[in-house]
Amino acid sequence: AGVIHDERGFLAMKRSENQPSPGKWEFPGGTIELDESPEDALLREFREELSIEVSIIKKAGVWQHTYPFFHVDIHVFLVESSELESIQMTVHSEKKWISSSKDFDLDWLEADIPIVEDLLDKFY
């Protein structure tokens, strides 16, 4: 997952109705393909999901979550981009800049909630 943070806050994305967990908010990202590093997967996912290039600033950590039928390890990176005004959403229906603890009160994807809590602790 990639967390974009700038003067507007953090960028959150809402999943489209035709996606798994429709209407849930998340940080952009996706599945790591075979023979792909987490970093390369992140860069590819931003191109596929938002049609932008990003640069990785640093790795924020790895969060684990177990759903009823599968387990995920979420590699989280802080990223930046000069193309944020050019975002074209392919799997999301809405974007939102989050700039206060109140703004974080969204219907988050379950696996992203610990990431959100960590960001709240560090920034708000």
What is the meaning of each model-derived region?
Residues 53-54, 62-86, 96, 100, ...:
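Active-site-adjacent beta-strand/loop module that shapes the phosphate/pyrophosphate-binding cleft
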Residues 47, 51-58:
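A SAM-dependent methyltransferase catalytic signature shared across enzymes that methylate proteins
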Residues 2-3, 17, 64, 68, ...:
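Short secondary-structure boundary/capping segments
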Residues 32-33, 65, 103-104:
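Short histidine/acidic/glycine/proline-rich micro-motifs that form metal-
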Residues 9-48:
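Conserved Nudix-box catalytic region and its N-terminal flanking loop in Nudix hydrolases
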Residues 5, 22, 27, 69-74:
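Short connector loops at helix/strand junctions that flank enzyme active sites
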Residues 1-11:
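Conserved N-terminal beta-strand and adjoining loop/helix that marks the start
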Residues 24, 86-124:
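Nudix hydrolase/Nudix homology domain
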